[in-house]
């Protein structure tokens, strides 16, 4: 990309007052526009303290902060660049007491929420053979994304009646435990702004200039939040691409970006169409597909780089042949063009497609990484420690309490826990409150009572250690005290003894050491480090960053959703078949259009060359089933100029000949 912004970028960067929509096509430099606009505003005399920039991931926020420091040669004081959830957490920490919560609230991860839902299903006697917690977690997520409170749910069938009841009980328990789930961070901030206009006014005065990245991915709740904040001064600048709106299943509303100028009548619309990533051939093919959508802004992204060669469309006999072909094609490119394997990515619509590619790559000794594999903060040993740390901040957190009350083993068995649960429900109190009265409960055996006594003593002692006195000159040392706690309960021994193999146990110990190293780094980098702030930080990171656990090596294997925002010189899109892409569950025109956007996103990840494969048959339910090529392949071929036609057989023959020559 040029050192200087192009005409359209410059126009967006230098827009100061009033609403702005920057329609940023794939690879058109939208991050540059946001960061340079922030720097421009500050240079023009806007106080950094009055600027709020919101994005979807901590990684994107960190990159923006780094770029702005480079542009301004200093770190602007008071500037807020954060995710939606981090921003709302900041607000709630200061204001949540107005909504009847205490400031030491716990944030539930999605697995914590599912654990709570599972216990609710048992409590209200729902048959979990027919309905599991994942189904009701989906309902609750849908309701919250659409700002529907439990009393506002209008059930249309018996299942939705159960979902409404589960939602009601779930919210009651969360409030009783002084806890929020991830959606509550945004929804309660909206409630706060609506119920307390003076609070909204305070934040409107603070953030007079608002910028939102990836606006096409916002849901109703995020739209409502930003609309409230921007309603006073209307200095809202949003950047996004309607053609890359692929999160409808998470509640994203493409209408938010398509109707921006209807909401803000005097909005300035700037279209960024110069692509600095892909070749002309790749962009022509991608446009031939996406132009079939009706719900989109009319635009065409053009290449600033080389013309390139047309994408390859390859027919394979079946899915094993497809995996074999892609593996050997990568080997061919890596040998003939002297490329390392980090230049290649294989994208697919469904995670289940990765298995055969893994087998094919292992068979040929190819290094690869499956993006989106088991995440660090979801590992058992890490979740156990975090559950304890949550209890040290908020002893009422029932999900954390149930997770570790008998870790390490204290003689508190399932029967004792069930009895305690029944008593807490009967008395209308938290499980922690019931535990405090354990000596007065006859149904608890002596060994369990001893275990409860030891457990409570640990929780109370460390709760006292980590309860921060605002006037204290010195904050409690996190690393030192957490290390001391782990030694006290002999957790390392517990992990080793409960592991199937010594090797597995040692890996878990390494994970614990990694967690402790992270705590030490956090403490070194934050003068006012507290356990509560640390827990909030890593919860947000683990929820928002689903692919960024470690440096990826080798060929990237990932879903198209995981690939958004990334780029690779050589990209393979596997499974270009009817029923896969587009997905067999996408039947309405709206759903097909989202699948088409998904295809467009996948195609525009490629910088130099793109290969699309489809199978003539696949094994389903143990039987070979005939497959039809994706309609998107047909659209692509129809929309391409004649000089971009691909001779498929010639390509495969050339590939096989070159492989044979190299191996001989």
Language-model features: locations:
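Hydrophobic residues in beta-strands of the RecA-like P-loop NTPase core, especially within AAA+ ATPase
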Residues: 48, 211-218, 239-240, 573
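A basic/glycine-biased coupling hinge at the interface between accessory DNA-binding modules
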Residues: 17-20, 28, 39-209, 234, ...
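Helicase P-loop NTPase motor core
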Residues: 22, 26-34, 96, 102, ...
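Short glycine-/polar-rich loops that comprise or flank the Walker A/P-loop
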Residues: 18, 46-50, 75-78, 232-235, ...
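Conserved helicase C-terminal RecA-like lobe
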Residues: 156, 354-366, 379, 386-639
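N-terminal pre-P-loop "Q-motif" helix
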Residues: 2-16, 221
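Acidic, low-complexity intrinsically disordered tails
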Residues: 1, 641-664
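Conserved helicase motor core of SF1/SF2 NTP-dependent helicases
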Residues: 28, 216-292, 299-304, 440
């Amino acid at each position: 990309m040029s050192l200087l912004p192009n005409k359209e970028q410059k126009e967006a960067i230098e827009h100061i007052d009033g609403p702005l929509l920057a329609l940023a096509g794939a690879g058109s430099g939208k991050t540059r526009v946001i960061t340079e606009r922030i720097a421009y505003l500050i240079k023009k005399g806007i106080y950094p303290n009055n600027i709020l920039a919101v994005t979807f991931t901590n990684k994107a926020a960190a990159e923006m902060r780094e770029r702005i420091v480079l542009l301004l040669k200093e770190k602007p004081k008071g500037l807020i660049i954060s995710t939606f959830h981090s921003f709302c957490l900041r607000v709630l920490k200061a204001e949540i007491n107005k909504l009847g919560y205490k400031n030491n609230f716990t944030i539930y991860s999605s697995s914590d929420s599912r654990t709570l839902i599972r216990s609710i299903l048992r409590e209200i006697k729902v048959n979990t053979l027919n309905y599991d917690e994942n189904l009701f977690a989906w309902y609750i997520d849908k309701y919250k994304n659409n700002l529907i409170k439990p009393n506002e749910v209008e059930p249309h069938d018996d299942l939705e009646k159960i979902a409404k009841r589960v939602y009601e009980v779930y919210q009651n328990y969360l409030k009783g435990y002084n806890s929020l789930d991830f959606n509550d961070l945004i929804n309660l901030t909206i409630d706060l702004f609506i119920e307390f206009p003076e609070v909204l006014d305070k934040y409107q005065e603070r953030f007079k200039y608002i910028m939102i990245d990836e606006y096409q991915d916002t849901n109703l709740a995020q739209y409502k939040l930003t609309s409230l904040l921007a309603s006073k001064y209307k200095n809202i600048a949003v950047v996004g691409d309607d053609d890359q709106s692929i999160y409808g299943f998470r509640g994203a509303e493409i209408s938010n970006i398509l109707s921006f100028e209807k909401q803000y009548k005097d909005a300035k619309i700037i279209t960024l169409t110069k692509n600095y990533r892909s070749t002309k051939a790749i962009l022509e093919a991608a446009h031939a597909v996406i132009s079939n959508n009706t719900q989109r802004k009319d635009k065409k992204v053009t290449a600033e780089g080389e013309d390139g060669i047309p994408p390859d469309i390859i027919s394979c006999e079946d899915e094993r042949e497809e995996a074999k072909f892609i593996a050997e094609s990568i080997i061919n490119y890596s040998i003939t063009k002297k490329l390392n394997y980090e230049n290649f990515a294989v994208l697919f619509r469904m995670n289940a497609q990765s298995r055969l590619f893994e087998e094919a790559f292992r068979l040929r000794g190819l290094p690869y990484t499956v993006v989106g594999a088991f995440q660090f903060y979801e590992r058992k040993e890490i979740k156990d420690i975090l559950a304890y740390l949550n209890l040290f901040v908020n002893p009422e957190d029932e999900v954390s309490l149930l997770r570790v009350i008998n870790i390490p083993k204290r003689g508190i068995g399932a029967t004792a826990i069930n009895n305690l649960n029944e008593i807490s429900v009967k008395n209308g109190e938290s499980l922690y409150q019931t535990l405090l009265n354990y000596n007065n409960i006859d149904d608890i055996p002596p060994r369990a009572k001893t275990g409860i006594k030891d457990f409570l003593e640990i929780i109370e002692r460390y709760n006292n250690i980590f309860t921060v006195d605002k006037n204290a000159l010195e904050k409690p040392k996190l690393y030192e005290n957490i290390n001391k706690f782990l030694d006290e309960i002999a957790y390392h021994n517990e992990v080793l003894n409960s592991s199937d193999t010594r090797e597995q146990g040692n890996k878990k110990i390494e994970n614990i050491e990694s967690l402790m190293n992270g705590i030490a780094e956090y403490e070194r980098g934050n003068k006012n480090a507290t356990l509560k702030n640390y827990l909030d930080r890593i919860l947000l990171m683990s929820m928002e960053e689903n692919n960024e656990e470690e440096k990826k090596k080798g060929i990237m294997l990932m879903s198209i959703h995981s690939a958004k925002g990334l780029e690779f010189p050589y990209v393979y899109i596997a499974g270009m078949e009817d029923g896969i892409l587009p997905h067999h569950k996408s039947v309405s025109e709206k759903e097909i259009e989202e699948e088409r956007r998904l295809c467009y996103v996948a195609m525009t990840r490629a910088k130099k060359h793109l290969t699309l494969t489809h199978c003539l048959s696949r094994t389903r339910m143990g039987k070979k089933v005939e497959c039809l090529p994706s309609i998107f392949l047909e659209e692509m071929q129809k929309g391409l100029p004649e000089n971009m036609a691909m001779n498929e057989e010639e390509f495969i023959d050339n590939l096989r000949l070159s492989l044979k020559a190299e191996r001989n």
